[in-house]
């Protein structure tokens, strides 16, 4: 495996990127119910979490490298390959230049998953044209991207700090704008220690991936 000998410091020069969908309603928390044996067939309304349908959501793109976060970009429209390329042009390049100036845009290693918009021909052509060094990402292990854990922190903090998020008034556009504003506040407050912890875990993640022969791991 190409990156098996990377240290945490080596991993700090990888630009991890991803998209995330955040819903108006908090459906990210797991609830456990413990019942006595004689009550296992009974249904208690207070123990049932209703499923929210047609909840307004907002898609966002973000990135980080080392202990530095990039911008959190709302994608109000459906993400196409063209939209994705525009995001890279307008936000990724400037982030790399500001964060990794000694490497430069064309020496930084860029990570993306295998989403269709990322693997589209025009996206691949753009990356080749711009001479980006793209990390080969294992197809069966999305859990290898530490930004997934950053998304979990983002969502958890959103609903903790803004518990009325599920009651945001207005139509789809108004709710998406309110979500974007709140998420920007939460994103800004995620400190460097969080990213450092994720980067420090990368050698262990890689070893776990090797042990799992490329399949899913505990991460």
Enumerate the language-model features and the residues they cover.
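Extended, low-complexity cationic-aromatic segments
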Residues: 1-90
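C-terminal anion-handling pockets and recognition modules
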Residues: 10-14, 21, 147-219
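Acidic/histidine-rich, metal-coordinating catalytic segments
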Residues: 17-19, 101-118, 141-145
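Short aromatic-enriched loop/helix-cap "lid" or pocket-rim segments at secondary-structure transitions
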Residues: 26-30, 122-123, 147-149
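RNase H-like polynucleotidyl transferase catalytic core
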Residues: 42-48, 111-114, 128-149, 163-165
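Short, basic/hydrophobic alpha-helical segments
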Residues: 85-109
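Short, aromatic/basic amphipathic alpha-helical patches
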Residues: 120-130
